Regions:
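Amphipathic, Lys/Arg-enriched alpha-helical "gate/interface" segment within cytosolic domains
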Residues: 1-118
Length: 118
């Protein structure tokens, strides 16, 4: 489940609370498109409370939106107590150098929010 979080006009805020469904992905894409209506580039804040997985179809939906819009994303903050995100972030840095991605622990949540709004 994805919960939308209001952070700032140019920041898409997401909280992940379990498995991400296609419905969640459509909700996230709609929120992203709305942010992009009023900003050329946006940042993304993702707080992972619990990661319950994502289906291949849902992942494909995400990629179909994200890939053509890569230059519209400036940075991404990932807040998670899990360390498994760090290797993915390093891979993402190599594949998508135009998007700065940083991992933060839950104790660093305020730092993540400050950074993503800069």
């Amino acid at each position: 489940m994805i919960e939308l979080i209001e952070i700032a006009p140019k920041v898409l805020g997401l909280k992940i609370l379990g498995k991400i469904s296609e419905e969640d992905m459509h909700k996230m894409i709609a929120a992203c498109e709305k942010k992009m209506e009023s900003a050329e580039r946006i940042a993304v804040y993702v707080e992972v409370v619990e990661m319950g997985g994502i289906s291949l179809n849902t992942l494909v939906e995400d990629l179909k939106f994200v890939l053509p819009n890569l230059k519209r994303f400036s940075k991404k903050a990932v807040v998670s107590s899990s360390k498994w995100h760090e290797p993915l972030i390093k891979i993402g840095d190599k594949l998508f150098p135009s998007i700065e991605v940083r991992h933060f622990t839950p104790k660093q949540r305020e730092d993540a929010l400050k950074w993503v709004k800069e």
